[in-house]
Design a protein with these regions (language model features):
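HAD-like aspartate-dependent phosphatase fold
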Residues: 1-140
Length: 140
């Protein structure tokens, strides 16, 4: 399912002549396991970091952290990702997509691909195929 969304985003971008696609990433139960506030131990799902690194290194991909975490925790997460060479362009927003005659992004911002367990992403089975797909797609 997520591969279908990625392929559709790439196909549409190519057809429209877009230079970038916008990818949203939830944190808990998508990139990291949830601990529901018990301690600071969080584990990354297999292939999550490798996949995020590939995407972070691309100029044609915009990474958006999509989280309901508190600001203090977001700062901690962003620093951790930065130390791992993963850079999110935005947090809970996409200022690059502006309102037009056919779309209003004041409340719901624009994105192409959504990684969120609440949207059907299954981290234990979906990260590896996404990683493999990107390796093939980008020829790494």
């Amino acid at each position: 399912m997520i591969i279908d969304a990625i392929e559709a985003a790439f196909t549409r971008a190519k057809k429209q002549g877009w230079e970038k696609t916008y990818w949203l990433f939830d944190l808990h139960d998508t990139v990291i396991t949830s601990n529901y506030g018990v301690g600071e131990v969080e584990e990354y799902f297999p292939f999550a970091l490798e996949t995020l690194k590939i995407l972070s290194d691309r100029e044609d991909i915009v990474l958006i952290l999509f989280t309901s975490s508190h600001d203090e925790k977001i700062k901690v997460y962003m620093e951790k990702f930065k130390n791992l060479g993963i850079n999110f362009n935005y947090i809970n927003e996409n200022p690059e997509a502006t309102n037009s005659s056919y779309a209003n992004f004041d409340v719901k911002f624009y994105f192409n691909v959504l990684f969120d367990d609440k949207a059907g992403f299954h981290p234990m089975k979906d990260w590896e195929p996404v990683y493999q797909y990107l390796i093939e797609y980008y020829g790494k």
